[in-house]
């Protein structure tokens, strides 16, 4: 059993998959987005931004931050799942030993912003970040996330990282 890194855009199914794997197997879960929010709030000078849309500078800095965590994890017998919406494949790949880590990216490159919007609004709760967004702002954000999904899918293909397309739903996460 290897450690698992799950990256990808917001609302793609990363946390859902991580929670399922933790329930079924003996994994510890590290949601990097919690740390991203903490960096933004407590250490703004570091320049790590906790936005829904991945930022190149944040991706690079978070990957470097995680490199130490990954190094420590690599020396333990415990198994971990790290998930993040703030790290691009090209930034994290240099820190993950593929003999010790399975790497997955999840996104929705083959949908429209309207289709994804309807799915999100149908299933969201008042705890979801999307609940606080106006329809117009959410549609604009989804347009950007679809573009990022397409780029990450392309990068994953070039880097030999498994990419899971949840454009048609999240059923494939459980196969």
Where are these regions (language model features)?
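ATP-binding Walker
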Residues: 12
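Conserved beta-strand scaffold positions in the cores of enzyme catalytic domains, especially
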Residues: 27-29, 103-105, 163-165
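NTP-dependent small-molecule kinase module
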Residues: 147-175
